[in-house]
């Protein structure tokens, strides 16, 4: 990362709100924290659900926000505002590729299958040394406990090495995630 350029933080999360107000609170806190730190934000481009909340919060705080959305999702996921910078891709894979290329770190908030797909994409690429960018999973109200358990089970069953657990940080909430992110961005690259 160019030391003169402010970090771009990619946020993966649901295009729905989920069933607990704590999910929305965490999304808004992450967006506000990104803006307060002076970082920019990259996200999936839609204005619905947690994705919209985190982007609107970051934008309201003055952060530059870059949306990336596949053409076929534009009708389902309207932009957060007319001012939103939006890159339209032909497919989901191009969206994920651009998110990786344009970002210096990743925050994962609660979401559905798309969020898990995005998490595993960047985690596998970190495992294969495609990148050494920090990945912070925000475990709001234990949402990602089962993910962490599954990855431990994968190691116990002999399908992964313990180094898999070093691919991501598990944060208890938005404040902890932002603190971890600040430290990770200022630390030497993980190998």
Where are these regions (language model features)?
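A cross-family phosphate/adenosyl-ligand binding-site feature
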Residues: 2-102, 140-191
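Flexible, glycine/proline-enriched loop segments at strand-loop-helix junctions
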Residues: 109-110, 134-138, 165-168
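Arginine/glycine-rich "motif VI" loop of SF2 helicases in the C-terminal RecA-like domain
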Residues: 59, 125-133, 159-160
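Active-site/ligand-binding-proximal alpha/beta "capping" segment
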Residues: 94-129, 136, 187-191
